[in-house]
Amino acid sequence: MPFIFRYSFFNKALIFWYTILMKIYKTINHIAGENTYYLVNDQAVILIDPGSNGQEIISKIKSFEKPLVAILLTHTHYDHIFSLDLVRDAFDHPPVYVSEKEAAWLSSPDDNLSGLGRHDDIINVIARPAENFFKLKQPYQLNGFEFTVLPTPGHSWGGVSFVFHSDELVVTGDALFRETIGRTDLPTSNFEDLITGIRQELFTLPNHYRVYPGHGPSTTICHEKNANPFFH
C-alpha cells in the first residue's frame, strides 16, 4: 500500500506518523452492467453493492487475502443486491449496512424490482435482513476505513452515497453517473429529490473528488458540474 508521510516539530522532538491510502477496485456484473466496488486497505476489505456475478465477486475478495469486514449498500434495487447472501455465506456473514428506508426491500421482489414483469428472465431476489441501518452524515470508522454516508434519494427512496474524504472519492450508487443521473421513472423515484440531493450533498464536495457510480465509468465532481446536462 502507498503511504503519506507527515511530520512536525514539538518541544524539539520530531513527531512522525503515516496514513495508509485505501485502494478501490471494480468489477462489472452481467445484469444491468452494475458496478461492484471493493475497498482495500492494509487491514481489510469493504464491499459495496454485490451484483449478479456472485462467484466472480467471491474470487475477487479472496484475491486480496484480507478479511471482508462489511458490505455497504447504496440502495436495494435487485441489481445491487443480487449476490448479497451468497457473499455473506462465503465470508462468515460480515455485517451489512443499509438505509433504514429500504431495509424491507431486501426481502421484497416487488420493492427491489426483481419481481417486475419485465424482469421475468431473472429470479426473484430475496435477501436476509441487514444488521445495521446507516446514520446519515455521521462519520464511520471500520478497520481503518473512514467514510460518511450522504443522503442522495431520488432514484430510490433511501438511496445514499459514501464519501471517503481521506481518499478524495465518493461512491454514488445510482444517483450520479458520468454526464447523466439515475432513472426517476421507478417506484419511489422523484426527479426533484434527486437533483436537490446531488446539488446539496455531492456538488458541495471538492471539485477534484473522484466519483464512482453504480453503472458506467468514473468521473469527477468538477466534470459533472460542468458537463452534466441535467445541471445546465
UniProtKB/Swiss-Prot annotation:
SUPFAM superfamilies: Metallo-hydrolase/oxidoreductase (SSF56281). Zn(2+) 2 binds at residues 79-80, 174, 215. Keywords: Hydrolase, Metal-binding, Zinc. GO terms for molecular function: hydrolase activity; metal ion binding. Its cofactor is Zn(2+). It comes from the Bacteria. Its EC number is 3.-.-.-. Zn(2+) 1 binds at residues 75, 77, 155, 174. InterPro entries: MBL_Glyoxalase_II, Metallo-B-lactamas, RibonucZ/Hydroxyglut_hydro. SMART domains: Lactamase_B (SM00849). CDD domains: metallo-hydrolase-like_MBL-fold. Binds 2 Zn(2+) ions per subunit. Pfam families: Lactamase_B. It is an enzyme of class 3 (hydrolase). Belongs to the metallo-beta-lactamase superfamily. PANTHER family: HYDROXYACYLGLUTATHIONE HYDROLASE GLOC. This is Probable metallo-hydrolase M6_Spy0554.
